[in-house]
Swiss-Prot record:
It comes from Jasminum nudiflorum. The chain crosses the membrane at residues 70-93, 156-179, 195-219, 291-309, 346-369, 385-411, 433-455, 531-549, 589-610, 664-686, 724-744. Chlorophyll a binds at M683, Y691. Belongs to the PsaA/PsaB family. This is Photosystem I P700 chlorophyll a apoprotein A1. PsaA and PsaB bind P700, the primary electron donor of photosystem I (PSI), as well as the electron acceptors A0, A1 and FX. PSI is a plastocyanin-ferredoxin oxidoreductase, converting photonic excitation into a charge separation, which transfers an electron from the donor P700 chlorophyll pair to the spectroscopically characterized acceptors A0, A1, FX, FA and FB in turn. Oxidized P700 is reduced on the lumenal side of the thylakoid membrane by plastocyanin.
Length: 750
């Protein structure tokens, strides 16, 4: 820590009335670009308009102006998010069976959409229980609402209106901070102040206020709900806040107020700030008292973290000092210069944030099922499957985005003349070693992981089960994973004081938790089948990383095209007369990386879906016998490629294929339609631009003959545009197909 004299007095950090508000300007398509604003000559214009509308770098090179546009756009984004949230709460208030679900969450399915009777579409309104007919939803909103203490549709209305007000406020803020009071560049670059405010304000006070809400509102209301009290009889939230006696009846230590806190007798509060571990047997979710405790602890950590960085008072850490001190014996200049990169290149900053947020999103996916945070979430299999799948896809897209913006940084913002022997320079100088080794790892993983399956398929085909890799023949047990599981299962009592169960039931050791005769969670066994598919995961992830990292490290130059940086982020080929130089731009690496990201995530969600149906989800009889949805067939069936096709894809597709004439028929239509969208993508991906240009010229000739030719000349999509359209439809079609397949299946059997 460095003590310095205080900074000078607070500087004026905004420009007033920086840019006038002009609807005429906004009404002109392409007003941000001189060429596009001229209007269309050819149909390429509309594609350029879409490509460049949000590429603020192409509008101006002034970093301050770019920063202001990004900042303003963030408020617009927040406005849309609040609008979306408001819509969700409004549907809960107006069209849902929330109050009925609240009274019997184990037998009634959540629904918040009722289809109007137009051309027979009302067939989609299935019976979700309790006499309500509607579409079963799998977003988890009902479970969140219950956990936060919402007991009536009126409360949902109020929240929806509140979110609308916030949406309007955000829209106003976006306009205000660009047109009326636009921050100066120095404000955007003041990282210490930003860290303090984000850590202490957003994360610290945010967590503290949520912990406060949980203790004073959610916990008492959920206590009543768990005891079977009718939601209409439960006191309203403000009564708990205003009347301490009410809370003291449920949690006696409330009667003592803050005395235990100041006398350091904190264990008094353990009844509502608990440390149980495991799941609440009534709801199958984490103990809400554990969650409140967690948020209080997080709040304290972040409130401390938000006071660590040096701003106006000359005391605390400086980010620049930290980064420049960060060097080891073999790392040259270390992180020297990184501070300048991250305060002048928003692409570099965004790339780091996307990589971390993407990884975090995938961590969330894995915790939502292993430590289900909301009441009755674990027994709602459709929601569990949807939440896992959703967070996996989002994480995958964010990580590809990280590589995209890292490459844009390399092309547009990286200045090789000022960088020498820092870590980034050193990585770039030995990029050949990195990429060739990574390539070797991909080849090794690919042949060996796939080879294990091919061996099993061959042995199975030849009728030699005793020679297969399986739990009953040649075992390949995941011993390290089992060791980690076991360590965690034995941890309670040896690590955290007072913890009665391990963090997750999935580790083993504990009994199963079932709610209303349905399994919430139980110890998940790992065997040869998991070992095999795990190595497929390793293979697909390494290939994705290979493609993306190669795109970043070779974004500026390569042996093939030494002057690649001059060609920009996306270009089709290195000009005429240089064969074999197509598909080398940084953009093309992102394009190719998306396909492998899709491969990776598909295998993960297939693994999850089948494993959970086979070994976890199911019903519990009165005698205590568990019957799993697919009867534990994962261990023996998933060890061959044929098993995946026959017992997972084909066997479980029967629900979506046979959905016509039932309330699930929309999924059947989506399954079909999404396959079409996917197939449509191939037309863009497998076809050349010249083919289409020739076809267009014939069609234009016919239009001219009939004197109906448009003024705007039709043009075939450029190579890059065609690829962008192709990959979009490929991913959209693939994801929607998977969505229909998963939901029709799990709603029918779950």
């Amino acid at each position: 820590m460095i003590i310095r004299s205080p900074e000078p007095e607070v500087k004026i950090l905004v420009d007033r009335d920086h840019i006038k508000t002009s609807f005429e300007e906004w009404a002109r398509p392409g007003h941000f670009s001189r060429t596009i604003a001229k209007g269309p000559d050819t149909t390429t214009w509309i594609w350029n308009l879409h490509a460049d509308a949000h590429d603020f770098d192409s509008h101006t090179s002034d970093l301050e102006e770019i920063s202001r546009k990004v900042f303003s756009a963030h408020f617009g984004q927040l406005s849309i998010i609040f609008l979306w949230l408001s819509g969700m709460y409004f549907h809960g208030a107006r069209f849902s069976n929330y109050e009925a679900w609240l009274s019997d969450p184990t037998h009634i399915g959540p629904s918040a959409q009722v289809v109007w009777p137009i051309v027979g579409q009302e067939i989609l309104n299935g019976d979700v229980g309790g006499g309500f007919r509607g579409i079963q939803i799998t977003s988890g909103f009902f479970q969140i609402w219950r956990a936060s203490g919402i007991t009536s549709e009126l409360q949902l209305y109020c929240t929806a209106i509140g979110a609308l007000v916030f949406a309007a406020l955000m829209l106003f803020a976006g306009w205000f901070h660009y047109h009326k009071a636009a921050p100066k560049l120095a404000w955007f670059q003041d990282v210490e102040s930003m860290l303090n405010h984000h850590l202490a304000g957003l994360l610290g006070l945010g967590s503290l206020s949520w912990a406060g809400h949980q203790v004073h509102v959610s916990l008492p209301i959920n206590q009543f709900l768990n005891a079977g009290v009718d939601p209409k009889e439960i006191p309203l939230p403000h009564e708990f806040i205003l009347n301490r006696e009410l809370l003291a009846q449920l949690y006696p230590s409330f009667a003592e107020g803050a005395t235990p806190f100041f006398t350091l007798n904190w264990s008094k509060y353990a009844e509502f700030l608990s440390f149980h571990g495991g799941l609440d047997p009534v709801t199958g979710g984490l103990w809400l008292t554990d969650i409140a405790h967690h948020h209080l602890a997080i709040a304290i950590l972040f409130l401390i973290a938000g006071h660590m960085y040096r701003t106006n008072w000359g005391i605390g850490h400086g980010l620049k000092d930290i980064l420049e001190a960060h060097k080891g014996p073999f790392t040259g200049q270390g992180h020297k210069g990184l501070y300048e990169i991250l305060t002048t290149s928003w692409h570099a900053q965004l790339s780091l944030n996307l990589a971390m947020l993407g990884s975090l999103t995938i961590v969330v996916a894995h915790h939502m099922y292993s430590m289900p945070p909301y009441p009755y979430l674990a027994t709602d299999y459709g929601t569990q499957l949807s939440l896992f799948t959703h967070h996996m896809w989002i994480g995958g897209f964010l990580i590809v985005g990280a590589a995209a913006h890292a490459a844009i940084f390399m092309v547009r913002d990286y200045d090789p003349t000022t960088r020498y022997n820092d870590l980034l320079d050193r990585v770039l100088r030995h990029r050949d070693a990195i990429i060739s080794h990574l390539n070797w790892a991909c080849i090794f993983l690919g042949f060996h992981s796939f080879g294990l399956y091919i061996h099993n398929d061959t042995m199975s085909a030849l009728g030699r089960p005793q020679d297969m890799f399986s739990d009953t023949a040649i075992q390949l047990q995941p011993v390290f994973a089992q060791w980690i599981q076991n360590t965690h299962a034995l941890a309670p009592g040896a690590t955290a004081p007072g913890a009665t169960a391990s963090t997750s039931l999935t580790w083993g050791g504990g009994d199963l938790v079932a709610v209303g005769g349905k399994v919430a969670l139980l110890p998940i066994p790992l065997g040869t089948a998991d070992f095999l598919v795990h190595h497929i995961h390793a293979f697909t992830i390494h290939v994705t990383v290979l493609i993306l990292l190669k795109g970043v490290l070779f974004a500026r130059s390569s042996r093939l095209i030494p002057d690649k940086a001059n060609l920009g982020f996306r270009f089709p080929c290195d000009g005429p007369g240089r064969g074999g130089t197509c598909q080398v731009s940084a953009w093309d690496h992102v394009f190719l990386g998306l396909f492998w990201m899709y491969n990776s995530i598909s295998v993960v969600i297939f693994h999850f879906s089948w494993k959970m149906q086979s070994d976890v989800w199911g019903s519990l009889s009165d005698q205590g016998v568990v019957t799993h949805i697919t009867g534990g067939n994962f261990a023996q069936s998933s060890i061959t490629i044929n098993g995946w096709l026959r017992d997972f894809l084909w066997a479980q597709a029967s629900q979506v294929i046979q959905s016509y004439g039932s309330s699930l028929s929309a999924y059947g239509l989506f399954f079909l339609g999404a396959h079409f969208v996917w197939a449509f993508s191939l037309m863009f991906l497998f076809s050349g631009r010249g083919y289409w240009q020739e076809l267009i010229e014939s069609i234009v000739w016919a239009h001219n003959k009939l004197k109906v030719a448009p003024a705007t000349q039709p043009r075939a999509l450029s190579i890059v545009q065609g690829r962008a359209v192709g990959v979009t439809h490929y991913l959209l079609g693939g994801i929607a197909t998977t969505w229909a397949f998963f939901l029709a299946r799990i709603i029918a059997v779950g």
